[in-house]
Amino acid sequence: MTKYIFVTGGVVSSLGKGITAASLGRLLKNRGLNVTIQKFDPYINVDPGTMSPYQHGEVFVTDDGAETDLDLGHYERFIDINLNKYSNVTTGKIYSSVLQKERRGEYLGGTVQVIPHITNEIKERVYRSGRETNADVVITEIGGTVGDIESLPFLEAIRQIKSDIGRDNVMYIHCTLIPYLKAAGEMKTKPTQHSVKELRSLGIQPNIIVVRTELPVSQDMKDKLALFCDIDTKAVIEARDADTLYAVPLSLQEQNMDQIVCDHLKLDNPAADMTEWTALVNKVRNLSKKTKIALVGKYVELQDAYISVVEALRHAGYSFDTDVEVKWVNAEHVTAENVQELVGDTDGILVPGGFGDRGVEGKIVAIQYARENKVPFLGICLGMQLASIEFARNVLGLEGANSSEINPDTPYAIIDLLPEQKDVEDLGGTLRLGLYPCKLSEETNAYNAYNEPVVYERHRHRYEFNNQFRPDMEKEGFVFSGTSPDGRLVEIIELKDHPWFVAAQFHPELVSRPNRPQPLFHDFVRASITNKESK
């Protein structure tokens, strides 16, 4: 029978529930269990696809085209699985589904209520995740903090699941904070006690408490928490700030967290073999070289907006025993006069995805600098579109060349709306989303990176390269090295007379893994290291 683990949070948000859940998933997978994982977000948006990155961080896209929470990126990178649309559920999705059923008459004229209709829909999403993946264990993270009014239906639903399928099949893990008060020189357990008290008042008794802390938690403090929270002392797990996220699974294993889980859920699996993971963490902690990459974006104040890009750069660096330092460059501040000052000390330049016109001209200036000064360059999504526009303007001499998204009246729409998007009015969930094939041309940097004729990558875009400009740009050394299999859509571009200048319409960062870097990032970082060594 499938087992269910629920991870909740208390005291404050951003405690690392997602990392805790992902780390536990890694440990259970390494015990030979088939693990899947999902995130429940209490906000009323149907998905984060139309939310500002300042509100939510990056939007993580799954193979099947779901626009999801950035925690799913952590889940995929840690557990090394590909998740799907069932892996992220919001209050908006739940209510939308229930209201559609009500309109279809599925409730037979009854009064639709939070209990049982909303809670039953939530429970169905939990069970469906297990059915669709045939998982041994389903880990569900509940977003937000215990005590939030938005979370109440989710907490009631997961309380009911224990009654539905039995205590041996359900486990509750609660993540809290033990703050350190400098003035008093003390760590305080009272916020955790109150958080657990609140959770218990809702009918949920946590089986494990994971406490975030800056300093070590004494045995006396663990005993005190265990007494007041009614759990075993060994089930108080310390989660101190780590030097690398990838060390967290090892810390949890050292405290036998995965064994406690298996004992409670009656799972008789051998101990997790973390030899390979330990080697990875040791490598990360002992990188001997450095390279600096300029990330030129418009959301650089909130680095979570580009979290998968940064992780993909780091993964690539691990392959070369190199610590990749990211220099955050606000695209709105970049001009032709100061670009040398802002990016001249870096070994490579990356322009990530985005929407809208803010910061576009600064990104184009940075791309021109990379092209003219032979600096390794990687463009992603909008970065690929702007690389095409920069080339059209400054090599072909097409003054005013632009994207019809940014300037609908441009005389040269190098980037234009996909034909199937012409009549689309809704913004949410209507882009070209998910995994699509890309055919590569031989003897190109893209082909050399993948070493395969056809690759599959995840997309999230509405605009595409305008094919009427392909012949003129090819004549000037602009290479279309990757296209859709029918040749209609441009997927990857690069430059002939440049050491390494590649840009992709898709989002390669979404499939990178710490022990298996994404090929374009791998070769981009290698080119950046070579550039540094040649200076």
Curated annotation (Swiss-Prot):
GO molecular function terms listed in the Swiss-Prot or TrEMBL record: ATP binding; CTP synthase activity; glutaminase activity; identical protein binding; metal ion binding
GO cellular component terms listed in the entry, alphabetical order: cytosol
Family annotation (Pfam families): CTP_synth_N, GATase
Keyword Zinc-finger part of the UniProt annotation: no
InterPro entries cross-referenced by the UniProt entry: Class_I_gatase-like, CTP_synthase, CTP_synthase_N, GATASE, GATase1_CTP_Synthase, P-loop_NTPase
One GO process term, biological-process aspect: pyrimidine nucleobase biosynthetic process
Keyword terms: ATP-binding, Glutamine amidotransferase, Ligase, Magnesium, Metal-binding, Nucleotide-binding, Pyrimidine biosynthesis
Gene3D superfamilies associated with the record: 3.40.50.880, P-loop containing nucleotide triphosphate hydrolases
Domain of life, per lineage: Bacteria
Region (Amidoligase domain): 1-267
Pathway(s) the chain acts in: Pyrimidine metabolism; CTP biosynthesis via de novo pathway; CTP from UDP: step 2/2
List of residues binding CTP: 13, 148-150, 188-193, 224
Binding site for UTP: 13, 188-193, 224
Reactions catalysed: UTP + L-glutamine + ATP + H2O = CTP + L-glutamate + ADP + phosphate + 2 H(+); L-glutamine + H2O = L-glutamate + NH4(+); UTP + NH4(+) + ATP = CTP + ADP + phosphate + 2 H(+)
Binding site for L-glutamine: 54, 354, 382-385, 405, 462
SUPFAM superfamilies cross-referenced by the UniProt entry: Class I glutamine amidotransferase-like, P-loop containing nucleoside triphosphate hydrolases
Keyword Protein biosynthesis in record: no
Binding positions (ATP): 14-19, 71, 240-242
PANTHER family listed in its UniProt record: CTP SYNTHASE (PTHR11550), CTP SYNTHASE-RELATED (PTHR11550:SF0)
Extra remark beyond the main annotation: CTPSs have evolved a hybrid strategy for distinguishing between UTP and CTP. The overlapping regions of the product feedback inhibitory and substrate sites recognize a common feature in both compounds, the triphosphate moiety. To differentiate isosteric substrate and product pyrimidine rings, an additional pocket far from the expected kinase/ligase catalytic site, specifically recognizes the cytosine and ribose portions of the product inhibitor.
Record-linked NCBIfam families: PRK05380.1 (NF003792), PyrG (TIGR00337)
Family, similarity comment: Belongs to the CTP synthase family.
Summary of the function given for this chain in its UniProt record: Catalyzes the ATP-dependent amination of UTP to CTP with either L-glutamine or ammonia as the source of nitrogen. Regulates intracellular CTP levels through interactions with the four ribonucleotide triphosphates.
Quaternary structure, from the entry: Homotetramer.
Name of the molecule in the record: CTP synthase
